[in-house]
UniProtKB/Swiss-Prot annotation:
Protein name from the UniProt record: POU domain, class 5, transcription factor 1.2
GO biological process: gastrulation; gastrulation with mouth forming second; regulation of transcription by RNA polymerase II
Species whose genome carries this gene: Xenopus laevis (African clawed frog)
DNA-binding is among the record's keywords: yes
Organism lineage string: Eukaryota, Metazoa, Chordata, Craniata, Vertebrata
GO molecular function, one term: RNA polymerase II cis-regulatory region sequence-specific DNA binding
Amino acid sequence: MYNQQTYPSFTHNPALMPDGSGQYNLGTYTGMARHPHQAQAFFPFSGVKSDYGDLGGQTTSVGDTSAWNPLTSLDSANQLGISGQGNPFKNLKREREDDEEKSESPEPKCSPPSLPPAYYTHAWNPTTTFWSQVSSSGTTVVSKPLPTPLQPGDKCDPVEANKIFTSSPDKSGESGISSLDNSRCSSATSSSSGGTNVGTPRSLSRGASDGLSSDSEEEAPNSGEMEQFAKDLKHKRITMGYTQADVGYALGVLFGKTFSQTTICRFESLQLSFKNMCKLKPLLRSWLHEVENNENLQEIISRGQIIPQVQKRKHRTSIENNVKCTLENYFMQCSKPSAQEIAQIARELNMEKDVVRVWFCNRRQKGKRQVYPYIRENGGEPYDAPQTLTPPSQGPFPLPQVMPSQVFPTVPLGANPTIYVPTYHKNDMFPQAMHHGIGMGNQGN
C-alpha cells in the first residue's frame, strides 16, 4: 500500500557488544519485529572497573549465555525436575509404580473388593440454598464425609477393607438426621424439665419414682390420702376406746416421743401443716398396728405413773376467806410488794410464793377495772372520800343561777312586751291586723 524506503546498512559502534545468545532479540517475539533491521538489539556495556578490584564472574562471554525465561515461576517441568516430552504426571505415576514393585514388604497386599460405583439419589443443585432445604423438608441434612476408597496398591487389613462401604450414602445421611434429631430432642427435654422443676417439683418427683418401692410413695402422700388416713385413725381410736391423750402417751411409750392431746386432735381435724402431718403419719400407723396386734398395750398405757411423761394441768387454787382478808390488808398497805415481802407474806400465811405473787397481780388488775380509785401505788396513802363538786357560782367567774333547787326546772319568764295598736278607721273595708294575744271582741258589730 505504501512504499517503504530502504535504509542503509547500519554499522556497529565499537562501544556496543552484540547479543550472541539472542536473549534480547526482538525478532524472537512475534509481532514485535516489524522491520528487518530491528531483528538485533544492542545495549551499551560499561567498561568501568570496580573500586574493589576485578569481580569474577561478572563479565559475560558469548559462550556462557543462557536462554532467558521471563516466566520461570510457572515452569512446572523445571520445578518438578522432570525433563522430557509428554505428560509429566504420567511419568511420575510410572516411576512410583516402579518403586513399589522394587520394594519388598513382608505384609501381604490386598485389594479392596469390587464394589458398585457410588450412587446418589439427589443431584446437587448449586442454586438451592441451605435455608430453602430446611424450610421445605423441615429437617437439616447433616453431610457426613465418605471414606476414601483404597488404591489397588495400598496396604490394608482385609476385614477393615470390607467395612469401608458397608452403608450407603443415603443411610449415612439418615443416621446424621436421626442423630441431630436426637440431640435436638434431648436438649429440648432438658430445657423443659429445667423450667418445670421450679413450679411442680412434687409432681415430677412422683412421676419419676413410679418404678420405686411403695415406701417412697408413703413418704410423700397427697392430701386425699392424708385426709382418709385421719378419718380412719379417728374411727379406729373411738372404736377401740382410746382417747387422744392415750394415743399421745402411747406414742411416747413406743417411740420415746410423747405428743399432747392437742396435737392428736389437730391431726385428726387436719389443722396441722402438711409437712408435720407427713412426719406424724408413720408413727400413728405403727401405733394402729401395735394396737391391733398387741392386747397388752392398754395395760402399758394405764400404768402412767411409771414414767410421767404427760404433764398434767395444774388444779385451780382456792383461798379461804380469812386468808383473803389478810391479803386485802396487805394490799391496802402496799399494792405492789417486792420479792422479799412476797416471800415473807407466803411464810406467814403458809402459802406458796407463786400463789401470793399471782394474787397480788390479779388484785391490781381488778382495782384498775373498778369505778373509784384505790390505794396509791407509790406511797400507800388512800384517796379521800368521793370528791364533791363545787357549784360554778363559787368560782372566780360566777354564773347566774338559772336552775333552782326544785326537782323540775322552770324557765323564768319576763314581762310581756308592749303592744302598739294603730288608730282604727271605721270606714276601712279590711279589718285591722291584730296581735295574736289579743281577743277579737264582738265581730258582729
